[in-house]
Amino acid sequence: MKRREAREKALQALFQIELNEMSLDQAIKNIMEDEQDDYMEKLVEGVMANKAEIDAIIEPNLDNWRMDRLSKVDLSLLRLSVYEIKYLDDVPNRVSLNESIEIAKIYSDEKSSKFINGVLANIAPEDK
């Protein structure tokens, strides 16, 4: 599975966890069915293990927004992206930013992709 697809599947699992208060294992199983992808699982597990710290990074960068007002898709995507940016050294920040924007265009809308870009641009230094 390519990393883009793994990110999309991770977003779907995180969305299910957020929306339905589903367990991590059940969400991964629902999304992956009989497939397995280590990177996808690493993303979901990493976000959930570091959720409080990730939210503490996101919140001050929301500019007149509150976490509870964000759509579940946008919140899940921001968490996923911040995890990649702050916790994974093998993914350049610009790649994570671009992937997040493109995924937002698919699962959210143009306005959300611009919002996500703005939030992540404040969080991620370009040079990593």
From Swiss-Prot:
Keywords: RNA-binding, Transcription, Transcription antitermination, Transcription regulation. Pfam families: NusB. GO terms for molecular function: RNA binding. The keyword Cytoplasm does not apply. One of its GO terms (cellular component) is cytosol. InterPro entries: NusB-like_sf, NusB_fam, NusB_RsmB_TIM44. Gene3D superfamilies: NusB-like (1.10.940.10). It comes from the Bacteria. The keyword Transcription applies. GO terms for biological process: DNA-templated transcription termination; transcription antitermination. Belongs to the NusB family. Involved in transcription antitermination. Required for transcription of ribosomal RNA (rRNA) genes. Binds specifically to the boxA antiterminator sequence of the ribosomal RNA (rrn) operons. This is Transcription antitermination protein NusB.
